[in-house]
Amino acid sequence: MLEDKATRYTPVPLDEFCENRVRRLQELKEELLRELPSTSQSVDGYITIKGATEIINKLKNTIVKAKARIYVSATDSAIEALRGELTEAVGRGLKVVIITGRPFVLEGAIIYYAHKPNSQIRLIADSQEVLTGDLADGSNSTCLYSSKQNLVDLFKDALKNE
């Protein structure tokens, strides 16, 4: 008599595997939001963000949380990385103003073209938050984030002159 070993592992389809992981991450997010203490929403000082990926994530999150206006000045590649969030912002009825170096089309947004020789990026959200920095150095890129009104006003003037 031969005993056959039972199969202990059978790969699931990739789509099912991904759905399981996304579902688990969503559950973990909800648990963290329930369990972690709430934090103050306002940032009184200045925060330095390091790394291109982290900077892009902060830009995207700021756009998603905006309630009225977004002003962004960046190279075409940076604007392209933000396309989904900018499109969604226009869809929510936000005023979206983009200053970039190459032709870029986004229905409902106001777009200006200016010479953008470097990888500087500037974003103002709701006249309350500002992000400014450089994306040229990959993981060594840095960005300054603040909700200090004097810095927001300074960058509003700077964007008017671009």
Located regions from the model:
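Minor-groove-contacting beta-hairpin "wing" of winged helix-turn-helix DNA-binding domains
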Residues: 2-12
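PLD-like (HKD) phosphodiesterase/transphosphatidyltransferase domain
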Residues: 15-88
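Generic beta-strand structural signal
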Residues: 7, 68, 120-121
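C-terminal regulatory/effector modules of DNA-binding transcriptional regulators
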Residues: 78-162
